[in-house]
Amino acid sequence: MPHNYHLFDFLDFDPDLSRDESLWKAYKPTSVYEKDGDICINVPFQKQVLSNDMAPDTTSPREEYTLVIRQYTSGITRLFIGFGEESMTDQSEMLQFSDRVKKLPLQVTQTEGEWLITTQDGIQRALIHVKPPVLDRWSELLPDPQETLDLRLYPDGKREIRLAAYDHFSPPRYDALPLAFCKRNGVKERATLSFESKPDECFAGTGERFAKMDLSGQTFFLKNQDGQGVNNRRTYKNIPFYLSSRMYGTFYHTCAHSKLSLAGQSTRSVQFLSDQAMLDVFVIAGDTMEEILRGYRDLTGYPSMPPLWSFGIWMSRMTYFSADEVNEICDRMRAEHYPCDVIHLDTGWFKTDWLCEWKFNEERFPDPKGFIQGLKKKGYRVSLWQLPYVAENAEQIDEARKNDYIAPLTKKQDSEGSNFSALDYAGTIDFTYPKATEWYKGLLKNLLDMGVTCIKTDFGENIHMDALYKGMKPELLNNLYALLYQKAAYEITKDVTGDGIVWARSAWAGCQRYPLHWGGDSCSSWDGMAGSLKGGLHFGLSGFAFWSHDVPGFHTLPNFMNSIVDDDVYMRWTQFGVFSSHIRYHGTNKREPWHYPAIAPMIKKWWKLRYTLIPYIVEQSRKAIASGAPLLQALIFHHPEDKLCWHIDDEYYFGNDFLVAPVMNSENRRDVYLPEGKWVNFFTGERLEGGRWLKNLDVPLDEMPVYVRQGATIPVYPDEVECTDDMDLSKSIGLHIDPHFKGIFKN
């Protein structure tokens, strides 16, 4: 049986080998030369006999391709090889080089056994071994190993990252290939590259990954899809980037469907397989996680700063159906002194629920502009739900079809998403077509001109795959679609309102430029909360600064729409939300705090704490957008050398100064790991030494384990407010975590 063999298990060859497929493995380079500061390496590829025991197929001549090595500042080395007509380019929606990215000319010194590649300052950046391995021959039982590409990279001049030149059991039995490509029906279709991994190496990142902190041993399909929850291998936000405990990160510059194995298929290798006949890989090394993530942002863009009001409370549910209903809720929040900044209208503001036509229902919202302006006078911004598909019975369908604003379908498809209606989505808006993008922006502009301040760019993970898009094949557009979609909504929002913001669910590399993103349709349960936090931590280690989640989860169980959320889940998730970059209440049933009377006073207290902390959140956000830091920081972001931290995914740093440990059970107990340092309990003022566990803590429902660095000064707002319109950040004061600090509610 072919199972668990590299050819079939990772490279996805048909087990019965009935298709016209071939595998071409990289051999020892034949020559090397310098060109415009790059190093070009001519690499021959030998066709392989398709079998569990790989061997060269000498009936086919070798094919030779050029591998390019380019060096940048910030400890970044780039590898590029195209097996078709592709060439290296910086013109990509995913790339947005910062001024820190400067090309460093490379030079090569050739000796008999190796080619040394250095920058002009003499620092080693790559090394290629061209001498065959030394053998002590005594047996002819097995064939000699095939030629290979033995390449080592030194992106920062210090750390060595090797291609997996010899990851095999015996010469015919490969578990990974350093570099190879695949053909089908004579056409080059896929390419693979592998780096060595170490036995104790740990990994993180890859997007909003709902998994444990250390991703080693796992293999992921980098194909965006509706995650349908936060407790499975599906995800809304794949990012082709990972971080290693060896203090390097790798960004695979592609939007093709891909597979990434982090020492999963082979414990000796990190393997990448792209459904595209080219590889463009950036390897980034640094002394800290922040340096590596900043290097990634140097390549793909920095987050922009969300507006002040976005850091306040957002209130929503699925869904409000009328202006009267919304006004009643907003007035009650003000009357009962619940601070709040944003009211979100989900799927119910249209003529028909879920029928997105980008127009208000005239009966239930008779004066939308007046309605929005009235809310603004009360201190509320309005956010609106929509999605990037046009329904068969939407009023825009004829215009969209006639002008190719939606990609024409080549055959009918069934929806794979989580829409809760029977609508037939006739097509996906084609953001590869500039006229379609402008048409879509026009639909949003009409709403923004009324005073709407944020567009919820829901969905975008799935597109119609059997459709003709103007600028790209659907197989390449699928992952990139999130970026094009959110960019369009962000740009028109900023143009009209002056505030750059979206509320987005899907993501790919580069989407961090257009905040902000939330974690999708989590279950209102302890495992839903835990899964959300795991996803947020990995997302922050994938280049994103801002992230939120539905409080207290989106859907319920066992009844998806109608089960009741437990008080303690609502309370504990509120605490988690207060210590997140953004906090929005949303879900399939009522989310307003007065529906939970037993805990409503505690909820109000925590909402007020959120507004007290907004000066700190703004301060940390400004630092984040100019660095590599997220707001929600995994412990490994600060302590990558601490092995324990690679196995903790239920605690996090909130900014630089807070350590947060949400309670995610009904027993009101948990263990807390305090990293190295001196810590102060934010609620009790207790002083604690780090580098140890606090076991079986009893945590009252109105508190959460939150610790602040001893000696820190936390900017806080001294006055109670109804919304951020009442705030003047110049009036913020410093809360000194000194011997006089007795706890936030006691000072």
Regions found by a protein language model. Give the residues of each.
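An acidic- and aromatic-residue-enriched active-site/binding cleft used to recognize and process polar
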Residues: 74, 82-84, 113, 120-124, ...
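Beta-strand-rich binding/interaction modules
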Residues: 65, 79-80, 90, 95, ...
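Aromatic- and carboxylate-enriched substrate-binding clefts and catalytic-loop regions
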Residues: 82-84, 144, 156, 173, ...
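Residue-level recognition of beta-strand termini and adjacent short loop/turns
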Residues: 35, 71-75
